[in-house]
Amino acid sequence: LGGEPTLDPQVQEVLDEAIRIGRDDIYLDITTNLTNVTDYWLKSLSRFKDVQLQFSIDATGKTNEYIRTTSHWPQIEKNIRRYLNFEIESNTNWMLSFHQTVSIYNIFDFWKLHEWVESLRAEDKFNRIETEFGYHCYVLHSPAELDAKILPLEYRAEILNNFNQYRPNIKQTHEDTGIQSVITLLESNTRPEHADALFEYCKKRTKAVDKVRGHYIKKYIPHWPMP
């Protein structure tokens, strides 16, 4: 099933039926954007023995709200805490992980999400979670006009300089692998074929989308390279 599972009644129906027939041994692998969570949903998940929850978030604050237009960052923070608190209180042992896709919109401060995840890990009450929640980072490749590789080199240099101030905080673990792919992009001196044309198209596309939504990108992403 596609879409946001917490909003799809068919997903809840499947969980309810599995619980009814005693199939709590089913492995659940669920990806959610954290825009919605209910007590009934949490209690349903707690009935299963093997649950993996993947939180799909692209950034923090206003940047995430721009990329995920239906999201509201304070609600996202509230919802992740509901998951974490419920896991502690119900003594479940879910596998939790955050997944970020880096595009031309969020690359300007992509490390802020990792920093936020680290701040959650550092909270005393969440240190009690048996399985530490992970962070995974991926570079977007399609559509081409949103691929961060089309950024002019001067922007890459500025982003890399800003990132290097945070870089020492990243542990040498599997998390470093995903972030390293972004670093490789930023350190590269090459751009894709037709990068200039794609970059101009991206700016025009962004302006057109903003007009439809009634948004202005620089109010959400101040470093965005357009007036």
Report the location of each language-model feature.
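Core AdoMet radical
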Residues: L1-P9, I21-D39, S46-K78, M95-I104, ...
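Distinct, well-ordered alpha-helical segments
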Residues: Q10-D16, T38-L45, D109-W111
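Alpha-helical packing segments of well-folded alpha/beta enzyme cores
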Residues: V14, I76-N79, Y83, L113
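Acidic (Asp/Glu)-rich catalytic clusters
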Residues: I19, K43-D50, L84-E89, R121
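Conserved, well-structured beta-alpha core segment at the onset of a catalytic domain
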Residues: I88-N91, Y105
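Catalytic cores of alpha/beta
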Residues: I104-R121
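PAPS-dependent sulfotransferase catalytic core
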Residues: S142-Q165
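Radical SAM enzyme core and accessory elements
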Residues: L160-P227
